[in-house]
Swiss-Prot record:
InterPro entries: G_OBG, GTP-bd, GTP-bd_Obg/CgtA, GTP1_OBG_dom, GTP1_OBG_dom_sf, OBG_GTPase, P-loop_NTPase
Gene of this entry: obg
The protein, known as: GTPase Obg
GO biological process: ribosome biogenesis
Entry binding sites for Mg(2+): S173, T193
Species this chain originates from: Prochlorococcus marinus (strain AS9601)
Cofactor(s) required, per the database record: Mg(2+)
Stretches that traverse the bilayer: none
Amino acid sequence: MQFIDQANIILKAGKGGNGIVSFRREKFVPAGGPSGGNGGRGGSVILMADNNLQTLLDFKFKREIIAEDGCKGGPNKRSGASGEDTILKVPCGTEIRDIKTGIILGDLTKHKQSLTIAIGGRGGHGNAYYLSNQNRAPESFTEGKDGEIWEVQLELKLLAEVGIIGLPNAGKSTLISVVSSARPKIANYPFTTLIPNLGVVRKIDGNGCLFADIPGLISGAADGVGLGHDFLRHIQRTKILVHLIDAIAENPLHDFEIIEQELKKYGKGLLDKERIIVLNKIELVDDDYLKIISKKLEDLSKKKVLVISSSLKKGLSSLLSEVWKRI
């Protein structure tokens, strides 16, 4: 399935039904009073969060959503039927923003949480509504009102509690594949991962914790370079960031600084999040080098540095224990 995390759509609520002009014409009431009914309300457009969805793909080609119009009134003071509301299902974590003003209209983070965006137009009045002592046979009616029209941007921000970040080829996908049931594409070259991968990791108490492998972070990501800018938003909701560094990289310290700088430039509180610094692929370096580079990283980051081998599943228990302590 294609991963789409942004979509601009137009939401059009239904028009209210018109009122009608009608008079009672019964067998023994040849000159009855006004009986024209009111029109029904137009349908509204409602967004609803759904746990079963993980992408905004449905809105890639369907950019205009139109709710049903209300029906016109009927004789004998019968009101027209209201238009059916249109309910659009979106993934949990979808933020809705008014494109014209930039104002955030809502943030749907829980299953079945809903938000009415475009409200249907009110139905018009039939002539029975205008009956008065001064006018016993009104012939006035009103048309239904137009429904609201909104142009909105949908932006999906994943609801993972733990975000795995790092330069391409640091081993993020391998890590999420060995600690969860996720099965991302893995290969020994940069940019294998082109979309965020999600995996549920079971804690000791049996409860699940959602991890996300965030792809494409390189120098300049916060400014739109590479793939990273599109995906940095997905770590805004995380509680903890696991910063994975390739132990066999040419300069692991420089790699660490690149990601830290991108978090700082992007802003939005990313640099304030709890971060666990992890050296990966330790099976490919000797012990002396590992001790030296770990110490330098600790001095640079002012944080404890964990060492793991995702491929050999070494050090993973210590890493997960550290994660559970901080959630």
